[in-house]
């Protein structure tokens, strides 16, 4: 990650990758995962799947080289563990609900 995250912009990081929940990123995530409010509801109910979390992260990745594949990114997030991914997920879900 070449830049530091900007919390005022709703950015987070996971596995050394900056996540920026731009409109385009969230639309792409919604196309794959279904309505974002339903995603937030599943997360609140403890029903969010690992694959859904990683897909949200993948669509929100920012400033990542083309050499990083989705499989490699997924493996990196998984290797970091849920404890490391939870703060980024919380930030992105808060951004979905609150916007800025």
Regions found by a protein language model. Give the residues of each.
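Glycine-centered positions within short beta-strands or beta-hairpins
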Residues: 14-19
């Amino acid at each position: 990650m070449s830049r530091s995250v900007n919390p005022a912009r709703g950015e987070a990081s996971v596995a050394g990758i900056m996540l920026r929940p731009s409109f385009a990123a969230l639309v792409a995530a919604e196309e794959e995962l279904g309505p974002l409010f339903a995603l937030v509801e599943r997360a609140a109910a403890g029903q969010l799947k690992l694959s859904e979390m990683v897909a949200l992260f993948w669509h929100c990745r920012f400033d990542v080289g083309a050499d990083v594949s989705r499989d490699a990114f997924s493996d990196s997030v998984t290797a970091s563990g849920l404890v490391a991914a939870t703060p980024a997920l919380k930030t992105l879900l808060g951004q979905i609900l609150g916007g800025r």
